[in-house]
Amino acid sequence: MENDAGENVDLYVPRKCSASNRIIHAKDHASVQLSIVDVDPETGRQTDGSKTYAICGEIRRMGESDDCIVRLAKKDGIITKNF
């Protein structure tokens, strides 16, 4: 879609669930997006790095969101493997 200036713009870019790879629809009001930032261990301040997880409403409805977040965080190295 183009605006008045002739630039390409997207009105809506759908997100995908990080746990199940399902598309999160615009009307999925039960979905959440979590941003986990990297913290400097010496100063306790936020660094430039971050990781974002999107969990769809269906995963939350089944009560599996906490397990999915732990699994994704282990895979990305945020949580140790023997947690």
Curated annotation (Swiss-Prot):
Q: Which InterPro entries match?
A: Ribosomal_eS21 (IPR001931), Ribosomal_eS21_CS (IPR018279), Ribosomal_eS21_sf (IPR038579)
- The entry's protein name is Small ribosomal subunit protein eS21
The record's annotation in PANTHER family points to: 40S RIBOSOMAL PROTEIN S21
Q: What does the similarity note say?
A: Belongs to the eukaryotic ribosomal protein eS21 family.
Q: Where found?
A: Cytoplasm, Cytosol; Cytoplasm; Rough endoplasmic reticulum
Q: GO CC: one term?
A: rough endoplasmic reticulum
The cross-references to PROSITE patterns, in alphabetical order and at most eight, read:
RIBOSOMAL_S21E
* Keywords of the record: Cytoplasm, Developmental protein, Endoplasmic reticulum, Ribonucleoprotein, Ribosomal protein, rRNA processing, Translation regulation
Under the GO molecular function aspect, what terms does this record hold?
Answer: ribosome binding; structural constituent of ribosome
Sorted alphabetically, the Gene Ontology BP terms of this entry are: cytoplasmic translation; endonucleolytic cleavage in ITS1 to separate SSU-rRNA from 5.8S rRNA and LSU-rRNA from tricistronic rRNA transcript (SSU-rRNA, 5.8S rRNA, LSU-rRNA); endonucleolytic cleavage to generate mature 3'-end of SSU-rRNA from (SSU-rRNA, 5.8S rRNA, LSU-rRNA); lymph gland development; regulation of cell population proliferation; regulation of translation
Quaternary arrangement and interactors, per the entry?
A: Component of the 40S small ribosomal subunit. Interacts with sta.
Question: Per the UniProt entry, what species is this protein from, by scientific name?
Answer: Drosophila melanogaster
Lineage at the top is: Eukaryota, Metazoa, Ecdysozoa, Arthropoda, Hexapoda
Q: What is the recorded function of this protein according to its Swiss-Prot or TrEMBL entry? A: May be an associated component of the ribosome rather than a core structural subunit. May act as a translation initiation factor. Has a role in regulation of cell proliferation in the hematopoietic organs and the imaginal disks of larva.
